Design a protein with these regions (language model features):
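Enzymes that bind and transform nitrogen-containing heteroaromatic metabolites
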Residues: 1-145
Length: 145
């Protein structure tokens, strides 16, 4: 298995735009990683102010229209990197084509839902998978329409 840095670089190379919600973005800022190298960062929040975060684009309204415009523009794939509420909104608007889920072999007994309620049922089609020596299973799906 290639080193983690090589796998991470390969993942990052697919994308030129990253979308995050406020609750995902704030820990990124605290960790000194408000942006990802080579990617435009869009933060979806009704409370953050653009002038406080000049290195990213803060989207306060019209999330669906913003993402539709990003999808229509030329470029690489768009990465929704955390933000369950944002994921639900974009999924319900038909703006999610595919998703990748990593199953980590640790039972937490609680946590944040992948798709918070209320949400409609969505059918997925498995398109790929990888099993790592660590026990992590990476599953790739397309969203059925």
């Amino acid at each position: 298995m290639p080193p983690a840095s090589m796998r991470r670089d390969a993942i990052y190379a697919q994308f030129d735009t990253i979308l995050v919600g406020r609750r995902t973005f704030e820990p990124m800022v605290r960790a000194g990683r408000a942006t990802m190298p080579g990617m435009k960062t869009f933060v979806f929040s009704s409370t953050l102010r653009q002038q406080d975060y000049p290195d990213v684009t803060v989207v306060g309204e019209n999330a669906e229209q913003t993402v539709a415009a990003l999808r229509a523009a030329s470029g690489k794939d768009i990465w929704l990197f955390g933000g369950g509420e944002l994921f639900r909104r974009l999924l319900e608007a038909g703006l999610v084509d595919a998703m990748e889920v990593a199953i980590i072999p640790v039972l937490l007994g609680g946590g944040i839902s992948l798709l918070p309620p209320p949400s409609k049922q969505t059918t997925l089609q498995l398109t790929g998978h990888r099993i790592y020596a660590t026990g992590i299973a990476a599953l790739e799906y397309t969203v059925s329409t």
